[in-house]
Every structure is written in C-alpha cells, then in structure tokens.
C-alpha cells in the first residue's frame, strides 16, 4: 500500500483467501471461516476492547451495518469474557471474535498482528462470497479506518 488509507486493488489483495479460523464470539459461540462462505463479509481487526478509537470505529460500523448489508466480524486478541462484558456495556449487531489463543493466531495469519504490542493492528479485509480477500486497508495506530472504504467495498462485493 502506498498510504495508510488506500485500499489495495482487487487484482492485488494482501491475501489470496481468508485463512481458516475457529474463534469464539462474545456469546461463547464458535464462528468459523466456513460460516462465511456464500455471502460477503468484512473482517475488522482492532487492538483492544474498551478503548476509545476501537469503540468509536465499531459504533460507526454498527450504525452503518444495516445499509452495508454485509456480515461484519470484529476481531481482537482480547479473551472472550472481556468481549462479553464489552458487549453488555456497548451492544453491537455483529460478532466480536476473541483471537486469544493461540494468542493472535488468526491476526498473524492475516498479517494483522503487531508483535511489539501483542495486539491486532487496525486492518480490515473485504471478503467475497467464495472466501477470497478482495481488498485490505490498514491505518496507523490510533487512526480510525474511513467508513467510506466499507461503503465502497459493500457496493463492489
């Protein structure tokens, strides 16, 4: 990518396909890659629950979710009980997935893990109905991803 907010082209995504995963959501339910097949999705990595930038981003996505019409999976390295508590405090209409153990394994497989902080980086993936990653965006630490990126890719997928 040439800058922090520019999506990669669909011809040159960062990953060819979304890696396999099996993660618990805020309700303790297992969510797998196979659950996504047949419909497009956004996989949204974020560093931590209960933090202002992450909360603001996810609140913005929650407000836009009905218009986007695409499944959203928000992924952090927080443990599932933390995500459950955050959901009670700030409910959102999508899965909050715990990439806790092996710690950040899914984020690492998606090149969305910060080895220094031990948390996910601000990376989002646009995934088509076949599981192919069509686009990727990453923003700097503390910088929210633009909602327009999701709106554009919702139209393209």
Residue ranges, per PLM feature:
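Chalcogenol-based redox active-site neighborhoods
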Residues: 1-157
